[in-house]
Amino acid sequence: MSEIRTLGEFIVAKQHDFPHASGELSSLIGSIKLAAKIVNREINKAGLVDITGASGDENIQGEQQQKLDIYANDKFKAALENRDQVCGVASEEEDEAVAFNKELNKNAKYVVLMDPLDGSSNIDVNVSVGTIFSIYRRISPIGSPATEEDFLQPGNKQVAAGYIIYGSSTMLVYTTGNGVHGFTYDPSLGVFCLSHEDMKIPQDGNIYSINEGNYIRFPEGVKQYLKYCQEIKPAENRPYTSRYIGSLVADFHRNLLKGGIYLYPSTQAYPNGKLRLLYECNPMAMLIEEAGGKATSGEERILDITPTELHQRVPFFVGSINMVDKVQNFLDEWQD
C-alpha cells in the first residue's frame, strides 16, 4: 500500500521552499481546509435540509444570492478570522472588503480574496460547485487594519491560490508558486490526501468550454474561433468537443486534467466580461500558469492587470497554452 500524505503533512514538508517561512501561510491554508470540510458537509445534505435555493437577497453585482452562498461566505470568513493569520478578506458576496479588528488580526501578514461558492445555482440540480481563493501579502503597515489597497494588487503578487471542487469526490487544489498539487478528501478519515502531485495541463487539448447560447453576442474573433473548433479536420483532431458545465471550477478542473480551453468573452450585455478579476480570474490564472498553461483577457496577461475596484470584471480565456494562443490569434485578426 502506498504511503498516504495528508495536506497538512505536505504543506509542512514544503515550507523549506520559503526561506522566511514562519508557518503562518501553512496555518492559513489549514483554515481554508477546515471551512471546506464544513461547507462540503452542508452541500452533501443539500437535498435533505433547507439550504438550497435563493435567499431573496442580491449581491453587489445584482445577482441572486443562494442560501449556500451566504452559508459558505460566513464559514470561510469565520475560519479565516479565528486563526489570526489574516488581517482581512474580500469576497464576491460582500459589497466591501472586511478588515478583521482583533489585535492579532491587525498584526497578520495576509489578506484573502474568495468566491466562497462558485456555481451555486447548480446546487439544486446536483452539479459540481466549488470555492476559489487567493492569498496576498498585505502592503499596509502591520499592526493597522487592512485597507482596500491590500486587495487591489495585480495577480502576479499572489503568494498562493487554489480551489475546492465539491463533486463526486471533494478535492482541494492549490499552488504557492512551486507547482500545482491536488488533494482528495477522505470522509472516513476526515483528511485531504495527496492524490495529484505536480499537476500539468497538456499543451494541447480538444475540449472547449463556453456558453454557446450567447453566440450571437460574442465578439467576431470568438465566433470565428468557434467555427474553427467545429471544422471537420481529422488530421488536426478537429472538430473539438464542447463541454460546458456552467461552474467555472468544474470546467477548469476538467480542462486542467484533460487539456482544453475555457472562454468567457465580453458580450453586448457584459462589455467588460462577466467573471471577477480578483475572485475568479487571478487565482485560476496563477494555477494554470503554474501548471504550464496560459490565461489572458484577450488584450493582456490576466496576472499583469492592475485592478481598480474590488468587483472588477474582465473577459477570460484560460487553458492549454496552444489553445489560448490560437484563440488570441483569432481575437487579434478579427478585432471589432
Swiss-Prot record:
What is a biological process (GO) this protein takes part in?
fructose metabolic process
Q: What is its main location?
A: cytoplasm
Which PROSITE patterns has this protein been placed in? Answer: FBPASE (PS00124)
Which amino acid positions bind Mg(2+) 1, per UniProt? Answer: 92, 115, 117
Lineage top rank: taxon:
Bacteria
Sites binding substrate sit at 118-121, 211, 244, 262-264, 274
Q: Which UniProt keywords apply?
A: Carbohydrate metabolism, Cytoplasm, Hydrolase, Magnesium, Metal-binding
> What pathway does the annotation place this protein in?
Carbohydrate biosynthesis; gluconeogenesis
Cellular compartment(s): Cytoplasm
Required co-factor(s) are: Mg(2+)
Entry binding sites for Mg(2+) 2: 115, 118, 280
The EC number(s) given in the record are 3.1.3.11
Looking at the Swiss-Prot or TrEMBL record, what is one Pfam family this protein matches?
FBPase
Q: Does the keyword Metal-binding apply?
A: yes
One GO cellular component assignment for this chain's record is:
cytosol
Describe how the cofactor binds.
Binds 2 magnesium ions per subunit.
Reaction(s) catalysed by this chain, per the record, are: beta-D-fructose 1,6-bisphosphate + H2O = beta-D-fructose 6-phosphate + phosphate
Which InterPro entries does this chain map to?
FBPase_C_dom, FBPase_class-1, FBPase_N, FBPtase, Fructose_bisphosphatase_AS
Q: Which family does it belong to?
A: Belongs to the FBPase class 1 family.
Quaternary structure note: Homotetramer.
Output this protein's name.
Answer: Fructose-1,6-bisphosphatase class 1
Q: Which organism is it from?
A: Aliivibrio salmonicida (strain LFI1238) (Vibrio salmonicida (strain LFI1238))
